[in-house]
Structure formats: C-alpha cells, structure tokens
Amino acid sequence: KLGDQRQIDIASWNTFDFGGVXKANANTGIGNVVIERTDNPNTVPYIPA
C-alpha cells in the first residue's frame, strides 16, 4: 500500500529486470519491493499492487 516501507533481505531477491523500464522487482516473503534505478532519467515512480 502507499507509504508502506519494509526492510528486505537482499538474498531473497529473485527477479531483476533492468531492461527498458529499468526496474528491479524484488519478490520477498514480506512483500513486493521495487528498486528504482537513479541513473535513468526516464524511470518513473512505481507503486506495487
């Protein structure tokens, strides 16, 4: 949900997609986290469903 912040275990990240949208989706047991690349000016904020 909006405003929700969670700590995540890096070892649990299982999906990385840096093509096109430049995002890495980290699917963990404690929620879905989206890591935004800061070097891509075309990257837009994304809120997981």
From Swiss-Prot:
The keyword RNA-binding does not apply. One of its GO terms (cellular component) is extracellular region. Its main location: secreted. It is found in: Secreted. Negative results: does not show any hemagglutinating or hemolytic activity against rabbit erythrocytes. Does not show antimicrobial activity against both Gram-positive and -negative bacteria. Keywords: Secreted, Toxin. It comes from Spongosorites sp. (strain QM G324170). This is Soritesidine. The keyword Secreted applies. GO terms for molecular function: toxin activity. Very potent toxin that exhibits a wide range of toxicities over various organisms and cells including brine shrimp larvae (Artemia salina), sea hare eggs (Aplysia kurodai), mice, and cultured mammalian cells. A SOR-containing fraction cleaves plasmid DNA in a bivalent metal ion dependent manner suggesting genotoxicity of SOR.
